[in-house]
Amino acid sequence: MAAPSNVFWDPAGHLHTNALHWEGFPRLLWESLRSFLYTEPPQYDAVEYQDEGVRRCRVRMTIPQHPFRSQWQPIEVDVVGHRIVDTIEGAALEAIYLFCNQHPREVVGQPIGLFSTTDPNDPEWNLRVVPEGHRLEDST
């Protein structure tokens, strides 16, 4: 059972939520964390603002310290977007990537482990991507 959703605005105009009231990456992240025995869902702090006339949104999200695995430190994500809902989704997806990178052995065999943990700046990753380009070049 999912933790109850908590959504509220503070006096400074920040939205605080665990984002469990809709389907998407926040719920997938929480369901995955629960399978690793986390007891508290990630918390999202979102604020909208104007930047040179462009509507922006900043979301700070924290996966709390694991309740009994002290070596699993909290994960903090800071994402900037344009709308609160989309930026919360982006923050949750970024947290999934970070969690998978920090705990590669633990996520093997878990649905969350299907998310890529690669770095496009890594030469080995580039070797996997570049050879596919020959298919387009040879089709002329």
Regions found by a protein language model. Name each.
Residues 1-71, 82-85, 89, 93-140:
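N-terminal segment of the canonical double-stranded RNA-binding domain
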